[in-house]
């Protein structure tokens, strides 16, 4: 059974290794739409794609965009998309950090620091986009009724530059994540190798036991059953003999205990009778003396009562 569990564990670890070894394809497309379609499907990349799609729509500077730029709706939408992107990115980073546990502490700290810096640059770029749009909205509101062509051209230029920065930082972040995941894969491979080394002797023992069982299986089934029956019969006879001997010992012990109890009961009865006789000899004289004193006291009381009730002689005679 232990060998079976060991084999299952090795199979499970091999599956985990295969899962870790999935390649990460770097992004090479320069355009926003191509970048969104070429992503590997990570949640943070999908969230960043939605941010880019929204930025692409803002860059059109259509009439609807111009109307919504005069309200805080665009900045609110961008803030929501930014928060969603950073949240998904942090979750993915935490997942990779768990996979990096077998890696050396120094390597893990360096990779984490580089990834955190790339993450901060991407967040700063998205915040810069939002700030530019807020500034543009304030300037448009201040120039209501005037020509805003120059302002729109300046905003379009800023957004194009910010778009390039976003693409560059996102590509850098993906490369950092690829390095991060490669470190996780390396640590997982080392962990699996160590486990395989520890499980090697167990697997060999299981192989030897399996060979032994196979040699036993070559014996005729009837001979093995007969030998097993004889062993069981001998074992049952031995257990029966021990049980009978033990029962005889218990009977003897019970008889001894009963005799001792009867003897002790007889001794207690004799001691009680002797004690009762002593008590009687102690208290009988005392009781007789108290009876005599009580009788004398009664006679005295009666005499005193009789004397007090006698008639007194009259002086007139």
UniProtKB/Swiss-Prot annotation:
InterPro entries: ApoA_E, Apolipoprotein_A1/A4/E
Region entry 8 X 22 AA approximate tandem repeats, spans: 80-255
Record key words, sorted: Chylomicron, Endosome, Extracellular matrix, Glycoprotein, HDL, Heparin-binding, Lipid transport, Lipid-binding, Oxidation, Phosphoprotein, Repeat, Secreted, Signal, Transport, VLDL
Sequence repeat placement: 80-101, 102-123, 124-145, 146-167, 168-189, 190-211, 212-233, 234-255
Region (Homooligomerization): 266-317
Region Specificity for association with VLDL, annotated ranges: 278-290
Annotated signal peptide: 1-18
Disulfide bonds: none
Region (LDL and other lipoprotein receptors binding): 158-168
Protein task: APOE is an apolipoprotein, a protein associating with lipid particles, that mainly functions in lipoprotein-mediated lipid transport between organs via the plasma and interstitial fluids. APOE is a core component of plasma lipoproteins and is involved in their production, conversion and clearance. Apolipoproteins are amphipathic molecules that interact both with lipids of the lipoprotein particle core and the aqueous environment of the plasma.
Official protein name in the record: Apolipoprotein E
Organism from which the protein derives: Macaca nemestrina (Pig-tailed macaque)
């Amino acid at each position: 059974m232990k060998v079976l569990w060991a084999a299952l564990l090795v199979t499970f670890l091999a599956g985990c290794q295969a899962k870790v070894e999935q390649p990460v394809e770097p992004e090479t497309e320069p355009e926003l739409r191509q970048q969104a379609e070429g992503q590997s499907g990570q949640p943070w990349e999908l969230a960043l794609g939605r941010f880019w799609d929204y930025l692409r729509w803002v860059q059109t500077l259509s009439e609807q965009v111009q109307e919504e730029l005069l309200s805080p709706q665009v900045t609110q939408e961008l803030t929501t998309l930014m928060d969603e992107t950073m949240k998904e990115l942090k979750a993915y980073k935490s997942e990779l950090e768990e996979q990096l546990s077998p890696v050396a502490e120094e390597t893990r700290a360096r990779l984490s620091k580089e990834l955190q810096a790339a993450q901060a640059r991407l967040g700063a770029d998205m915040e810069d986009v939002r700030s530019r749009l807020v500034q543009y909205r304030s300037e448009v509101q201040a120039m209501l009724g005037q020509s805003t062509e120059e302002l729109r051209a300046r905003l379009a230029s800023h957004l194009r530059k910010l778009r390039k920065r976003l693409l560059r930082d996102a590509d850098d972040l993906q490369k950092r994540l690829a390095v991060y995941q490669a470190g996780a894969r390396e640590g997982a491979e080392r962990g699996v190798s160590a486990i395989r080394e520890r499980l090697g002797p167990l697997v060999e023992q299981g192989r030897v036991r399996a060979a032994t069982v196979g040699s036993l299986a070559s014996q005729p089934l009837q001979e093995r059953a007969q030998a097993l029956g004889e062993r069981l019969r001998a074992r049952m006879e031995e257990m029966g003999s021990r049980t009978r001997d033990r029962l005889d010992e218990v009977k003897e012990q019970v008889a001894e205990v009963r005799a001792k109890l009867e003897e002790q009961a007889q001794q207690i009865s004799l001691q009680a009778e002797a004690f009762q006789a002593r008590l009687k000899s102690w208290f009988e004289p005392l009781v007789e003396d108290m009876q005599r004193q009580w009788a004398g006291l009664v006679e005295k009381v009666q005499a005193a009562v009789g004397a007090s009730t006698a008639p007194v002689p009259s002086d007139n005679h």
